[in-house]
């Protein structure tokens, strides 16, 4: 008895559920499936519906403006070929296009290294070119004792040697002629002023003064001239 009572209760509940299901379901099964799909689509893409509504509003506004311009008599450009396109922004493409890090790594970095290498070369060459004259000017000629002694003896003999004498000294000492010229110039600048200042006032004589020794030398060199000058006036015949 208990089993029959339980079976009757199960059948009655199933029938009641079937009646409720028939009341809430539509008559056309395809419409029910379509509504379910649209509901799911609305839940997944709500922004698409918003974009469509905005697009419809713009189209309505455009149509009203066209009607208003036609009523007012304002000429309009042909709208053929003018279509409004709505595209979603490409975030990844835009970020990659305007990303400075990507551009610097792909394009600018190798170019910067090449420019730096090319710029370093002329700078180094310019530094060498600038350093070369200074290095040349700092070089000093080192003379041996024999060369120095020989040059000093030649300076004592003639402080102002000409080109021929300098070439002769250069051939003997194996020193270039320009170096010999510089050596004599430096030697004159150092020693000749000292020699002039070391003389005593008695030894200094004006250039126009002539001593007895110089007069005797002149007399020895030109005896005829001095004999003509020293002839007394009494030796000449007196006119009558």
From Swiss-Prot:
Question: Per UniProt, which keywords does this protein have?
Answer: Activator, Developmental protein, Differentiation, DNA-binding, Gastrulation, Homeobox, Neurogenesis, Nucleus, Transcription, Transcription regulation, Wnt signaling pathway
Q: Where is this region: Disordered?
A: 193-240
Site Determines DNA-binding specificity — annotated at 185
Q: Name one GO cellular component term.
A: nucleus
What residue ranges does this record give for the DNA-binding region?
136-195
UniProt GO MF annotations? sequence-specific DNA binding
- Which InterPro entries does the entry link to? HD (IPR001356), Homeobox_regulator (IPR051306), Homeodomain-like_sf (IPR009057)
The question of whether Cell division is a record keyword is answered with no
Supply the source organism for this entry.
Xenopus tropicalis
Q: What does this protein do?
A: Essential for Wnt/beta-catenin-mediated formation of the Spemann organizer and for induction of the organizer precursor, the Nieuwkoop center. Acts as a transcriptional activator, cooperating with TGFbeta signals to induce a program of organizer-specific gene expression and to generate an organizer with both head- and trunk-inducing activity. Activates the head organizer gene cer1 by acting synergistically with otx2 and mix-A/mix.1 through the 5'-TAATCT-3' element of the cer1 promoter. Also binds as a complex with lhx1/lim1 and mix-A/mix.1 to the 3x 5'-TAAT-3' element of the cer1 promoter.
Q: What is this protein called?
A: Homeobox protein siamois
Places the protein is found: Nucleus
Example of a GO biological process term: positive regulation of DNA-templated transcription
Q: Could you name the domain of life of the organism this protein comes from?
A: Eukaryota
Major subcellular site = nucleus
């Amino acid at each position: 008895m208990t089993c029959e009572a339980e079976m009757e209760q199960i059948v009655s509940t199933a029938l009641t559920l079937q009646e409720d299901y028939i009341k809430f379901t539509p008559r056309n099964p395809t419409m029910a499936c379509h509504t379910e799909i649209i509901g799911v689509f609305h839940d997944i893409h709500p922004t698409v519906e918003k974009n469509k509504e905005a697009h419809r509003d713009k189209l309505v506004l455009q149509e009203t403006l066209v009607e208003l311009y036609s009523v007012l008599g304002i000429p309009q450009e042909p709208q053929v070929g003018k279509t409004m396109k709505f595209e979603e922004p490409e975030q990844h493409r835009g970020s990659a296009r305007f990303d400075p890090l990507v551009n610097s790594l792909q394009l600018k970095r190798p170019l910067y290294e090449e420019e730096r290498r090319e710029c370093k070369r002329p700078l180094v060459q310019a530094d060498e070119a600038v350093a070369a004259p200074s290095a040349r000017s700092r070089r000093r000629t080192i003379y041996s004792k024999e060369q120095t002694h020989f040059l000093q003896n030649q300076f004592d003999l003639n402080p102002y040697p000409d080109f021929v004498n300098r070439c002769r000294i250069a051939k003997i000492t194996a020193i270039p002629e320009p170096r010999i010229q510089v050596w004599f110039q430096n030697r004159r600048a150092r020693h000749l002023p000292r020699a002039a200042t070391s003389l005593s006032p008695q030894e200094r004589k004006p250039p126009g003064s002539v001593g007895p020794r110089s007069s005797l030398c002149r007399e020895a060199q030109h005896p005829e001239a001095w004999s003509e000058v020293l002839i007394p006036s009494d030796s000449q015949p007196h006119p009558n």
